[in-house]
Amino acid sequence: MEEFKRYLELDRSQQHDFVYPLIFQEYIYALAHDHGLTRSIFLENIGYDNKFSLLIVKHLIIQMYQQNHFLFSANDSNQNPFFGHNTNLYSQMILEGFVAVVEIPFSLFSLEGKEIVKSQNLRSIHSIFPFLEDKFSHLNYVLDILIPHSIHLEISVQTLRYWVKDASSLYLLRFFLHMYWNWNSLITPKKSSFYFSKRNQRLFLFLYNFHICEYESIFVFLRKQSSHLRSISSGTFLERRYFYGKIEHFLEVFTKDFQVILWLFKDPFIHYVRYQGKYILASKGTSLLMNKWKSYLVNFWQCYFYMWSQPGRIHINQLSKHSPDFLGYLSSVRLNPSMVRSQMLENSFLIGNAIKRFDTIVPIIPMIGSLSKAKFCNVLGHPISKPVWADLSNSDIIDRFGRIYRNLSHYHSGSSKKTSLYRIKYILRLSCARTLARKHKSTVRAFLKRLGSELLEEFFMGEEQVFSLTFPSSTSQGLYRRRIWYLDIVCINDLASHE
């Protein structure tokens, strides 16, 4: 970042106008690709130690604009992912360098702005589980909402114009955006069919977080009492860049327009949580209040941000009757009845008391579906072998299966009931045994009889054993009876991931 500042050497009012020239700087591509400055393919002459590649980058950008990328189909994208075999790698690097460049104005302002530290409501993803346990037992309703997206790519460019006023950079951004004919890839980059979608998730994260930053700067202002929890998909771009600056601007410009609906936000018990492309509003209010929130949110997105939001994307759930799905947990609030005997002089009587309890359950059906998709079992949950791992050594096979189970057990350690985890352990253990038997061209029974069932026990360490290693043995039994949240694992996206 100091390199960026030394290069720009501009007033804050002029920094926006000089983003595009950075695309022609050699160190931009070194930072984007983690390459050395003297070994990049963008150097015009070998051994020439300058940091400009103006002619090469300019020539490639002209070539990109001249190509008719609408002629390529989804089937051609694998063989010709960009615009031809000659410019494939160069175009890829220009796109990644452009993403690094367009983040610079936001990064510079984030370093200069220090008011953001004052907020006590901006929290990380690790706060979600303690938040659920502490707050949900006192709440009644939850609005489960899918974050809407723009109905046209140009809306995203126009929104970005207010922060990056460099026309050339916006033209280049518009060009890259129109290469993605599947707009859903912006919200869920894993579903994109383009070759560079997996290699350029930084672009998706930047646009997505900027999209979130815009609406939260107004929405979170209206709910100062909310528990704002940051998204998992924060990537390299901090979401809350201009939170306090935009609040002051909002007070001056929009306060009068919202006087009619400000009464809606007087509920002191409403909480805001965002995660994985969704957000929830949890309240202690009534069903009528939540329906008013639902109606307002639809108009809020469509009128002020031109985002397509349907009422069907917002679900009102009563916590006592419905179990919302939060980051792999089914969360619910249950009444735990209890009877207390009271005695006064010679008379005794029973007092009924119902205590709300927050329960978290591992959803076994989605878990089995994920294991089935990763080829560890069939759709009914019957374990099968993993043929693609059969060529590995015994220790590697066991280590991969064991790592998956330990991660799942670690992540779901806060569950109120461990029955689902025992079934997952059974599926993975038997799948591991069948994979080893397939490798040695034997049956599972014969293989375990020859090597012993203790071979798998070492790698499928139970959660109690892991917990006993974390706390002293004298206190582990007492603490283990309570729900424990491990906050060192943020999320598990792919069960078969071992890289």
From Swiss-Prot:
Belongs to the intron maturase 2 family. MatK subfamily. Pfam families: Intron_maturas2, MatK_N. One of its GO terms (biological process) is RNA splicing. Its main location: plastid. This is Maturase K. InterPro entries: Domain_X, Maturase_MatK, Maturase_MatK_N. One of its GO terms (cellular component) is chloroplast. It is found in: Plastid, Chloroplast. GO terms for molecular function: RNA binding. Keywords: Chloroplast, mRNA processing, Plastid, RNA-binding, tRNA processing. Usually encoded in the trnK tRNA gene intron. Probably assists in splicing its own and other chloroplast group II introns. The gene is matK.
